[in-house]
């Protein structure tokens, strides 16, 4: 009887891990090869005037929820949870039709126009980056933005998987 109990105990412990679980990323979703020599030197996205992508800004449904993206640039500010996406999507098409580059300063947002630009500030450490919105997501009820791997790296939350941020749309100067 003791052997059976010990076997079940060992089997249960085998499923345990000492590594923290991540809310927004898996342990192996980061770079598959070497990082760029200094990711901190990758420049933020530079806001510029671009025509909006009609197909990427049409209303859509994801996971049973309807989204209606903004049809023009307008003020936007929201606080919430940011996550990041990496190697699993690297090289795959984004909602804009561009290929996802985990080393570019880009992000996915459910309703900000594609393309548009936003300043994202990590509320836990004050770091801030500017990203270009070129994809849709995240489709998780508590998350407001999905950043590229390098944007999350620069904000200091890759290991955590997610963090609390403020997202503010950057409007063109008139």
Spans of features found by a protein language model:
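Sec-dependent bacterial lipoprotein signal peptides
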Residues: 1-14
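Secreted/periplasmic proteins
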Residues: 16-174
């Amino acid at each position: 009887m003791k052997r059976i109990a010990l076997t079940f105990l060992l089997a249960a412990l085998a499923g345990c891990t000492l590594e923290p679980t991540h809310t927004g990323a898996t342990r192996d979703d980061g770079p598959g090869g070497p990082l760029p020599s200094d990711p901190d030197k990758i420049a933020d996205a530079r806001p510029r005037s671009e025509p909006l992508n009609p197909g990427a800004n049409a209303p859509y449904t994801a996971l049973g929820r309807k989204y209606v993206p903004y049809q023009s640039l307008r003020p936007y500010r929201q606080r919430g949870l940011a996550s990041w996406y990496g190697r699993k999507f690297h090289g795959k098409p984004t909602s804009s039709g561009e290929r996802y580059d985990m080393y570019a300063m880009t992000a996915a947002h459910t309703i900000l126009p594609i393309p548009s630009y936003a300043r994202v500030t990590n509320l836990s450490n004050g770091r801030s980056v500017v990203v270009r919105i070129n994809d849709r997501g995240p489709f998780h009820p508590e998350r407001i933005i999905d950043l590229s791997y390098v944007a999350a790296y620069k904000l200091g939350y890759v290991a955590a998987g997610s963090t609390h941020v403020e997202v503010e749309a950057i409007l063109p100067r008139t």
